[in-house]
């Protein structure tokens, strides 16, 4: 269900906003992968942490979803 909302954002809203994410993969793609790989709770925590780091003062760059659950 959460991934459906992210996909809706990706296809309906994101094209009008233009590229603004400082990371690769984009924050919305990261969130979908984190949710699929780690489940709702950990996936949401990882996604929120990523979105908080995506700001003008961040260097950005390549930041993949961690393979192992964080502790």
Swiss-Prot record:
This is Putative membrane protein insertion efficiency factor. Belongs to the UPF0161 family. Could be involved in insertion of integral membrane proteins into the membrane. Keywords: Cell inner membrane, Cell membrane, Membrane. It is found in: Cell inner membrane. It is a peripheral membrane protein. GO terms for cellular component: plasma membrane. HAMAP family: UPF0161_YidD. InterPro entries: Membr_insert_effic_factor_YidD. PANTHER family: MEMBRANE PROTEIN INSERTION EFFICIENCY FACTOR-RELATED. Its main location: membrane. SMART domains: Haemolytic.
